[in-house]
């Protein structure tokens, strides 16, 4: 951090409601600015995770590359965050249950009945269950419907998978078939997201029409 004295820093992190990273970042920013009052630090609670964080990071990068002023970057990121979203499809809820995110009984029933859970990151950064489906095809079709329902038209989509590249590729082609000009790419879930998404899980970050 000594090399950043006097610098302007933008920090984005996983949702503060499910991760301690946001609180840690806020505390670090306050401590740093107390020691270096000339520095500017902006901590953005993503209210999300995984591929939606990638969209936010790329937008910050593009704004800085354009030479936008720091305060304007902060304002624009708060606006942009309102127009990015996260959907997910989970084959297992075991790890979410272990960490108190869902009830163990719900996770057990989902496993026995081969139920996939479709959900989203809410406006306050919590995990909301939208519906439950049987089988992978039904889950992918539902994600496409949810994209449309959440205002997606043709912007960026990032599909992150946990050991399920075939489903991710299939979803990518479905999105491109339904939404002309869709900008879709596939990647893998990172460490923490892989833990919660579990094997077979998908996370979909996307921009709505007003992004």
Regions found by a protein language model. Give the residues of each.
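Arginine/glycine-rich "motif VI" loop of SF2 helicases in the C-terminal RecA-like domain
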Residues: 34
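Short glycine-rich anion-binding loops that position phosphate/pyrophosphate groups of nucleotides
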Residues: 14-18
């Amino acid at each position: 951090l000594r090399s950043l004295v006097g610098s302007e820093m933008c920090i984005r992190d996983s949702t503060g409601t499910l991760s301690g990273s946001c609180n840690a970042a806020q505390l670090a920013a306050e401590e740093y600015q107390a020691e270096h009052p000339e520095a500017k630090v902006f901590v953005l609670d993503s209210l999300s995770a995984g591929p939606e964080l990638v969209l936010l990071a790329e937008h910050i990068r593009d704004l800085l590359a354009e030479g936008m002023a720091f305060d304007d970057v902060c304002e624009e990121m708060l606006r942009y965050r309102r127009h990015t979203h996260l959907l997910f499809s989970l084959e297992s809820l075991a790890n979410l249950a272990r960490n108190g995110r869902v009830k163990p009984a719900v996770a057990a029933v989902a496993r026995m009945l081969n139920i996939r859970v479709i959900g989203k990151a809410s406006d306050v950064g919590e995990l909301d269950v939208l519906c439950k489906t049987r089988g992978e095809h039904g889950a992918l079709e539902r994600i496409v419907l949810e994209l449309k329902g959440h205002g997606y038209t043709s912007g960026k989509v990032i599909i992150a998978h946990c050991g399920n590249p075939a489903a991710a590729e299939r979803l990518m082609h479905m999105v491109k078939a339904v939404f002309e000009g869709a900008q879709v790419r596939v990647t893998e879930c990172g460490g923490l997201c892989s833990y919660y998404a579990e094997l077979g899980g998908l996370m979909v970050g996307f921009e709505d029409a007003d992004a």
